[in-house]
C-alpha cells in the first residue's frame, strides 16, 4: 500500500469526519443552529474533500505502483467505483455552501448527483469488485462463463448510474 501509515491515518480521519458531515444536507432547515451550519455543514464538509482526496490519491498511487496491471473484472469495477465517488464527493461539497444549499435543498440535486451516484455507482461497484474477487474463492474456482455479460453489467451499471445522477441533478437545478 502506497504511504501505508498516511493511508491508515487518512482512513481514521475520514471515519471521524464522516460522523459529522451529515448536516450539509440540512443547511436550509431552520431547526439547525447557525453554529452547527457553519462548523459541521460547511467547514467539516469542506475538510471532507481533503480526506476523500487523500484516500483517492493513495488508492490510485497503490494501483500505479502495482503496474503492469491486468484489467481484470474486479479492477474494472473498482475503478468504476472510484469514478462514482470522484463524481459524488464534489456534489456533496457544493451542498456545503449555505447560499447554494438554499436553492438546491429539497430538490432532485441532493438525491441525484450526490447520494445516488455515491451509493449506486461508488459503493455498489466497489462491492461488485469484491464479489468478482470472492466468487471464485467461495465456489472452489468456478469461472465466469461470459466475459461479454460481465462487460454489459459493468457498462450498463456505470453509464446508467452516472446518467441517472446527471439527469436528476439537471432536474434539481431546474427546481424539481
Where are these regions (language model features)?
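Hydrophobic cores of alpha-helical transmembrane segments in multi-pass integral membrane proteins
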Residues: 1-27, 41-62, 76-99, 111-139, ...
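Inter-helical turn/loop segments and adjacent helix faces that build the functional surface
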Residues: 30, 63-67
Amino acid at each position: 500500500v502506497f504511504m501505508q501509515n498516511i493511508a491508515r491515518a487518512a482512513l481514521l480521519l475520514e471515519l471521524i469526519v464522516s460522523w459529522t458531515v451529515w448536516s450539509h444536507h440540512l443547511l436550509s432547515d431552520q431547526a439547525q443552529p447557525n453554529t452547527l451550519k457553519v462548523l459541521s455543514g460547511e467547514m467539516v464538509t469542506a475538510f471532507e474533500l481533503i480526506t476523500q482526496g487523500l484516500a483517492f490519491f493513495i488508492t490510485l498511487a497503490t494501483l500505479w505502483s502495482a503496474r503492469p496491471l491486468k484489467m481484470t473484472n474486479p479492477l474494472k469495477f473498482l475503478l468504476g467505483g472510484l469514478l462514482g465517488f470522484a463524481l459524488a464527493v464534489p456534489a456533496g461539497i457544493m451542498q456545503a455552501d449555505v447560499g447554494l444549499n438554499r436553492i438546491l435543498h429539497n430538490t432532485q440535486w441532493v438525491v441525484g448527483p450526490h447520494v445516488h451516484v455515491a451509493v449506486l455507482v461508488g459503493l455498489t461497484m466497489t462491492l461488485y469488485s469484491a464479489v468478482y474477487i470472492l466468487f471464485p474463492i467461495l465456489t472452489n474456482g468456478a469461472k465466469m462463463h461470459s466475459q461479454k455479460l460481465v462487460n454489459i453489467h459493468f457498462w450498463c451499471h456505470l453509464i446508467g448510474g452516472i446518467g441517472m445522477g446527471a439527469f436528476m441533478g439537471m432536474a434539481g437545478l431546474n427546481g424539481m
